[in-house]
Amino acid sequence: MSETALNEAGPQVLEADGIRIEFGGRQVLSSVYLRVQTGQIVGLLGRNGSGKSVLLQTIFGARAVADASVRVNGRRVVPAFRERGLLNYLPQEPLLPPSLTLARAARLLGVDLENATARFPELRPQFDKRIGELSVGSARLVQALLLLHADTAFSLFDEPFSGVMPVHVETLAEEMQHLKQRKGLLITDHRYAEVLPLCDVVYLLHQGRLLRLDGDVREQLRDYGYLAG
């Protein structure tokens, strides 16, 4: 959805609940309710193995879960990825085929590559390179930028900063802040120092439950043992 159309239509609200998942008899997710709206960056924190990736997969529709409900403005959309222009998803593993050039990948996603990389001039000489020829960090950065600039109402990012050079992490975070004006972002990353300053809302996955943290988020994270005192 274009920025003009979004402003005219008002914010869209993505909600997910009813998600219960067990692995090997261990309940990974229960009592889950999550809300993201356009114009927001929402952070999803939790320890390794807490179910962050599974939750993103379920919201996107890549993982079928009985009784899971994903809604946009109250309308059920399961699987959500089939809803044109609704959302895209960057998993932890590489998303795009390594044989694709950057230019071809951008065309497939309907993204203006010049615009998407405007703050990363060092990527310009690599437009005709295959994604598999890039460094791990550059490939991750490019894929995050392409999904960020793609014309969807929401973007789900699982560890978007992983492997990205620190100087690029800062600029990518600034790009996210800028583009949240026209879409909603749901981000999970173990690098809480980069994620927390970005977020309008923070959720914590703790012992299978999804907790919305209000007030002093860092203090609450310390209380739950997520951050050192």
Stretch-by-stretch model annotation:
Residues 14, 29-31:
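Conserved structural motif at the start of ABC-family nucleotide-binding domains
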Residues 60:
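Helix-to-loop junction immediately C-terminal to a conserved catalytic motif
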Residues 63, 74-88, 222:
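ABC ATPase NBD coupling module
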Residues 159-160:
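Walker B catalytic motif
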Residues 209-229:
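Conserved beta-strand-loop-alpha-helix hinge in the C-terminal portion
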